[in-house]
Amino acid sequence: MEAIKGSDVNVPDAVFAWMLDGRGGVKPLENTDVIDEAHPCWLHLNYVHHDSAQWLATTPLLPNNVRDALAGESTRPRVSRFGEGTLITLRCINGSTDERPDQLVAMRVYMDGRLIVSTRQRKVLALDDVVSDLEEGTGPTDCGGWLVDVCDALTDHSSEFIEQLHDKIIDLEDNLLDQQIPPRGFLALLRKQLIVMRRYMAPQRDVYARLASERLPWMSDDQRRRMQDIADRLGRGLDEIDACIARTGVMADEIAQVMQENLARRTYTMSLMAMVFLPSTFLTGLFGVNLGGIPGGGWQFGFSIFCILLVVLIGGVALWLYRSKWL
């Protein structure tokens, strides 16, 4: 591969443009730098910025099909070969506090042995781990190592999010055992997050597996083995997602059953109350007709005796219900 001049990839509004020093560190890219396989360049762009969009549309360093892919609409994770270069689309967890985590962030990467061009619109938090390692001098030394570290960081964030969802499901199951129903929409959001994760992480696992099996010239055998380990780890996370989705289905049925039982219990209670007070209601209505005068209306103890009879009647009905095991 021919060397690239630093001025050819130095975009003014880039998120950052760095050169890997081959020892685990980076330095800012300068126009006089020479980019080759020993000192590759990482150019990270926000494709909605004007200068970045113009560079993506005009640079001769990228194949025509790659230009549109790096600045196009979000797609599912995939990997495509373009001659000596490789286009990779990945998804990562959105950890921003003002947005929902199920809205995964897309990151697109085109790379060969000399150049790494990554684009995004929303911030990719998983890249902070790789950036931190590079700034400390403990990061990747070449393009293959960079890709493995990025995929590892993305998988770490995905695994943490899956674990958080799993913990929520455990808490929800414990609450259901205590007959505590979650707030309206809680289970639906949890299930949606799991389904969205399943939708994007399954093809991303396939991307990792393909990168591990492809004989890319800028990846060593050790890096391919690490990539396969990452694919296997994400596969275990997908198994956990499948189990969680099944458990949410069971919990939805359990919640419906608990709500039905609560409704039946309340209806039963109201029916018993109506049965207890039905005789007393009949008597008070009968005495209140007042067609032939109220019985005992002229006796000073008439009302007291009537109240005592009502209490005895209600007690008798309640006792009968109790002995009949309705109460």
UniProtKB/Swiss-Prot annotation:
Residues 295-300 are periplasmic. It catalyses: Zn(2+)(out) + H(+)(out) = Zn(2+)(in) + H(+)(in). The chain crosses the membrane at residues 274-294, 301-321. Signal peptide: none annotated. InterPro entries: CorA_cytoplasmic_dom, CorA_TM1_TM2, MgTranspt_CorA/ZnTranspt_ZntB, Zn_transp_ZntB. It comes from the Bacteria. One of its GO terms (molecular function) is magnesium ion transmembrane transporter activity. The keyword Ion transport applies. Keywords: Cell inner membrane, Cell membrane, Ion transport, Membrane, Transmembrane, Transmembrane helix, Transport, Zinc. One of its GO terms (cellular component) is plasma membrane. It is found in: Cell inner membrane. Residues 1-273, 322-327 are cytoplasmic. It is a multi-pass membrane protein. Belongs to the CorA metal ion transporter (MIT) (TC 1.A.35) family. NCBIfam families: PRK09546.1. This is Zinc transport protein ZntB. The lineage of its organism: Bacteria, Pseudomonadati, Pseudomonadota, Gammaproteobacteria, Enterobacterales.
